[in-house]
Design a protein with these regions (language model features):
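Glycine-rich, often proline-containing surface loops adjacent to acidic residues and nearby aromatics
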Residues: 94-96, 125-133, 179-193, 240-242
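Compact, glycine/acidic-enriched structural inserts
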Residues: 122-166
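Long, contiguous binding/interaction regions
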Residues: 104, 251-275
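Gly/Pro-rich turn-and-neighbor structural signature
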Residues: 2-85, 191-246
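Short helix/loop capping segments that flank catalytic or ligand/cofactor-binding pockets
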Residues: 78-80, 109-111, 138-141, 253-255
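A generic structural motif
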Residues: 6, 104-106, 122, 132-139, ...
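Long, charged, mostly alpha-helical binding arms that flank functional sites
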Residues: 151-201, 216-218
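Internal mixed beta-strand/loop scaffold within catalytic domains of large alpha/beta enzymes
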Residues: 51-128
Length: 275
């Protein structure tokens, strides 16, 4: 399949998924709170792509949720090109993807994160994943969440869940705190074995995320919570901020490729605390 077609298919899927996820979120909010939409362009002097980020704040369920789509292209800086696969052979790049970060009002509902992307340099690959960060322990939620991920992965390859869970556990870890960010999930990168199969798996991950976040929210958003639990939530958000600013690949990639700062930092919670 021609690379132009691959890019178009990936780009169209990510944009469609943005619409689907935003619609689901607004339905959960009973359409009383809707997304603010902002389009942006990369590069002031030439067409280098751009994207659209959508933010919904102060809802009955979501304190802040961002759903970002982007399609950008251009040339890596000399300093950055050697850090990206294929960048040493061809400094030109194209990248498209969707990123979702949810910070909930109720401390019983965990923060949730999802992203998938397709990047092309001298060759192309998929990356992405999803993870959940509760501030209050819930072993039954953890077991259910990982079982859902395993079922989705097993539709494509029996080895994916174990492999991508391990990768997620290693990736979403704060070395300076010596603690994981949350209860894990799946994470994959540089996926380029078979384009059609890889793309099918990426679509599966996206639909699974939509179903998972809906189920978790409906189970938990009406539970009563205390001021103490809110304090725990705010401290846990502080850890979330630390990871995203210090270690997150997407944040680094966006800032190094002149992405939209507001869209890149949409993952940050509206309120957080440190002790």
């Amino acid at each position: 399949m021609d690379q132009t077609i691959k890019k178009k298919l990936a780009r169209n899927w990510f944009k469609t998924l943005q619409e689907v996820i935003c619609h689901e979120i607004e339905e959960l909010e009973a359409k009383k709170n809707i997304f603010k939409i902002k389009n942006w362009e990369r590069g002031k002097n030439s067409n280098e792509g751009g994207g659209q980020f959508r933010i919904l704040e102060n809802g009955k369920i979501f304190e802040k949720v961002g759903v970002n789509f982007s399609e950008v292209y251009g040339k890596f800086s000399k300093e950055f090109r050697n850090r990206i696969p294929g960048g040493d052979k061809n400094p030109n790049f194209w990248a498209a993807g969707i990123s979702v970060v949810m910070h909930m009002k109720n401390p019983h509902v965990p923060a949730m994160h999802f992203n998938t992307r397709y990047i092309y340099t001298s060759h192309g690959w998929f990356g992405g994943g999803m993870d959940v960060t509760p501030c209050l322990k819930d072993k039954s939620l953890e077991k259910w969440f990982h079982n859902e991920l395993k079922k989705s992965c097993n539709k494509h390859n029996k080895n994916f869940y174990k492999k991508y869970k391990k990768w997620c556990d290693e990736y979403f870890y704060l070395p300076h705190r010596k603690e994981p960010r949350g209860i894990g999930g799946i994470f994959f990168d540089y996926k380029k074995e078979n384009w059609e199969k890889d793309f099918s798996f990426v679509r599966e991950v996206g639909i699974s995320f939509k179903n998972i976040f809906r189920e978790i929210i409906l189970k938990k958003y009406k539970k009563k919570w205390s001021n103490k639990q809110r304090e725990i939530q705010l401290e846990k958000r502080g850890r979330y901020v630390e990871f995203n600013l210090l270690y997150d690949r997407g944040t680094k990639f966006g800032l190094q490729t002149n992405g939209n700062v507001e869209a890149i930092l949409m993952s940050l919670p509206p309120v957080a605390k440190w002790k």
